[in-house]
Amino acid sequence: MNYDPQEFKALTFHDAVAKFADGSDTPRAYLERCLAAAAEREPVVKAFVTLNEETARAAADASSQRWKASAPLSAIDGMPVGIKDLLETKEMPTQMGCEAYIGNFPKNDNSAVWALRQAGAVIFGKTVTAELGGNHPGPTTNPFDPERTPGGSSSGSAAAVAAGMMPAAIGSQVGGSIIRPAGFCGNFALKPTQGGIHRGERQATSMSTHGPHAGSIEDMWQVAIEIASRAGGDPGRTGLMGPMTTPSPVKPERLIVLETKGWAKLDDASRSAFEQLLDNLQRAGVKLLRRADHS
């Protein structure tokens, strides 16, 4: 299958809130569009472990009433969000891609999930993870080619966003489990500094970091900052800080280009696309420092 960036259009949420405010759209209607997309694409993409449709509809109805009353809880009030199945959710099982945890219902939400609910987000479902966040992948496919991997371990979160099933999802990372599937699926994603978003529960002593996948950079930032502003950072750590809207971009003065071992194996199309990116950066006035680093 050839890659077609037009096959799926990533959903955005930040541009829907004006319609919520003027009554021309509602969070419930937005959710129904997400559910319809999931019903159509999930049989192939296999991004979800659990979909909690009725609970999501109830949350979307409550959000619709808040927007109607001009009293949204936040800029993401009504946003459908998926949760990687490593993070605890009290009304859905947290099974971590592992048979030993089938039917495991935690008593509490993970701190990030709690913060999302406090902000009015609609918890859409639990997304597939590699077993225990490790190397054994789940059934999720890449939305642009079902024969290819979406990357892991936040595979379901990345694939669901890329397939246009929802505008954002939460992933977690130790080695590359947020940014790798985001790259494979073409999403925006943020891996904050460790401890920048409070992890809570059983992950409090792990090396993991929680962060969002999203179809737009605006939604990516908004989800991250809304969580951090409520849950804070880990004890003893400075939480993620910044404006409540997307920060203004800053052009870097210089960037280092590292040609690692994978560079020699890169296919011609990928190499050409990367070189074009470098050329665009140079034309924009960014100084590039190139080196080969095979250590």
Predicted regions and their residues:
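Long amphipathic alpha-helix in the N-terminal Rossmann-like dinucleotide-binding domain
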Residues: 54-61, 120-121
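An N-terminal boundary/leader segment
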Residues: 1-57, 283-285
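Acyltransferase
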Residues: 27-32, 61, 268-293
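A short helix-breaking turn/cap at a secondary-structure junction
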Residues: 191-277, 284
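Immediate post-signal peptide segment of exported/extracytoplasmic ligand-binding proteins
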Residues: 63-80, 219, 247-256
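Conserved hydrophobic/aromatic pocket- or pore-lining residues that grip, position, or stack substrates
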Residues: 56, 78, 84, 116, ...
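Enzymes and membrane/adaptor proteins characterized by extended Gly/Ser/Thr/Asp/Glu-rich
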Residues: 75-109
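Short glycine/serine-rich loop segments
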Residues: 108-227
